[in-house]
């Protein structure tokens, strides 16, 4: 596996220990490849993570995007910088107003988040 970059010395939230610890994080493509106190991939780009914090992506399991008074593409642009990577959306309000056409329009939007519709 070719590692694209390594974030060195970041404070990484370890979910299994429920705390932050200094770690190196190796990334290959769009996936985290490894987390360790010391990672060495000579061909990888190094990013200095000193003083930075890393957490797993946040998942909002019940969201009414239309209640935010915006649409899915804009909602994802606003929330992603705060760590939200995935949303389970209940689009009943858009369905009440526009029916299936509204739901299809909502679901057809390109977003930066993973959005699942319930």
List PLM regions with ranges.
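Short, low-complexity, polar/charged sequence segments that are solvent-exposed and flexible
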Residues: 25-33, 65-66, 77-80, 106-108
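Glycine-centered flexibility motif
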Residues: 15, 26, 49, 57-58, ...
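Catalytic metal-binding/acid-base residues of hydrolase active sites
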Residues: 13, 64, 92-93
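Structural signal for conserved beta-strand scaffold positions within catalytic alpha/beta enzyme cores
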Residues: 34, 46-48, 117
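N-terminal metal-binding scaffold of metallo-dependent hydrolase/deaminase domains
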Residues: 1-41
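Alpha-helix N-cap/helix-start motif
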Residues: 20, 68, 96-99
């Amino acid at each position: 596996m070719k590692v694209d970059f390594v974030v060195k010395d970041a404070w990484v939230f370890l979910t299994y220990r429920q705390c932050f610890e200094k770690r190196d994080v190796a990334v290959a493509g769009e996936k985290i490849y490894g987390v360790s106190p010391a990672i060495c991939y000579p061909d990888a780009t190094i990013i200095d993570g000193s003083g930075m914090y890393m957490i797993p992506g946040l998942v909002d399991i019940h969201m009414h995007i239309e209640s935010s008074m915006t649409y899915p593409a804009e909602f994802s642009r606003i929330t992603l910088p705060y760590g939200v990577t995935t949303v389970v959306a209940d689009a009943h309000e858009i369905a009440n107003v526009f029916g299936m056409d509204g739901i299809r329009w909502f679901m057809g939007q390109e977003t930066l988040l993973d959005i699942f519709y319930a």
